[in-house]
Amino acid sequence: MNGQTSKALRITLLVYAIWWAIYGLLHVVSPELMMAKDPAIERVLGAAFLAFALGAGMAYREKAWDRVKIVVLVQIAWMILYAVTMAWGLLAGGIPAAAWPPTILGAVFAILLAALYTREKVPGS
């Protein structure tokens, strides 16, 4: 697509940025609402979500694929690591079952972003 990001990727980045910014704010502002065992660690997790949401938001605004692809790769890695570690914690019983929906959403974003990244890659780059 002439070195430009697709509409599908841009929409995905926008939804990703909005969702994880809200989720991150909830962790930072009200870790008790997230049933945190350790509020300080929950706030750090929230800050990480806010940082990744900011990166996705900035990538959404950028149209050149060459300037967006590294951000997309980082988001994919983050979502894979998030989904795997959360699922591990849930299955081991250390995290409340209420965390399944965001864990599944993280896995969905990882798959969706990976599929869009593969589709966006320009042959020969």
Regions found by a protein language model. Name each.
Residues 18-23, 39-61, 73-81:
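Core segments of alpha-helical transmembrane spans in multipass integral membrane proteins
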Residues 22-35:
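Short membrane-interface helical motifs at transmembrane helix boundaries
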Residues 108-125:
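Membrane-water interface at the C-terminal end of transmembrane alpha helices
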